[in-house]
Amino acid sequence: MNKALIFDLDGVLVHTDRYHFLAWKQIAGEIGAAFDEKVNDRLRGVSRRESLEIILEGCEEKTTEEQKERLLEKKNSIYRKLLEQLTPESVEVSVRETLERLRANRTRMAIGSSSKNTDYILQRTDLLKYFDAVVDGNNITKSKPDPEVFLKAAQFMGANPADCVVIEDAEAGIRAAKAAGMYAVGIGEAAGYSETDLGIKDMREIQHLVSFN
């Protein structure tokens, strides 16, 4: 049976990691929390609220729920402003070429992301047209490494989880894929994770996992 593909968004199809870093760095600076690349690495693949909780570990003063909500809103506002820099040209050629070929082959494809800005990013980069389903932080209750996002993506595509391939760049995403009973492809740092089934350096490498008509 032909495989169905589920892509993470940030760091896989579009590189928005730097925007997240800059936004969280500003928030951390305002509350006096230590923040560097090491802390930022812990935020990859997890929800916005969980990311804030990690940052607050470095803050001596206690934060109320009301303050947390304000910080979350401010972080997203900063991040959304940075996302205005995205254009279709922000997508790597290898990514768009791969998606074009897979779409022409009628391969089922979905997005499985914890981000609540997924639709906005897909629209700005002209990537939405390639996907049969989009599951993101707006329609899940549990973030990665819980498998909910990937199981919903499979359901929306009408695909058996065992026939799905997940492409991820974060450890939480790889763990979620395996928990869903799916084949986990790691790109970037995730290529070397112990639970990764296949590590790749270039998006075009996933094409051999699909049967072409």
Residue ranges of each PLM-predicted region?
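Helix-loop "lid/cap" segments that line or gate small-molecule binding pockets
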Residues: 27, 49-63, 121, 154
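Short, acidic loop-to-helix structural element flanking the phosphoryl-transfer center
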Residues: 81-111
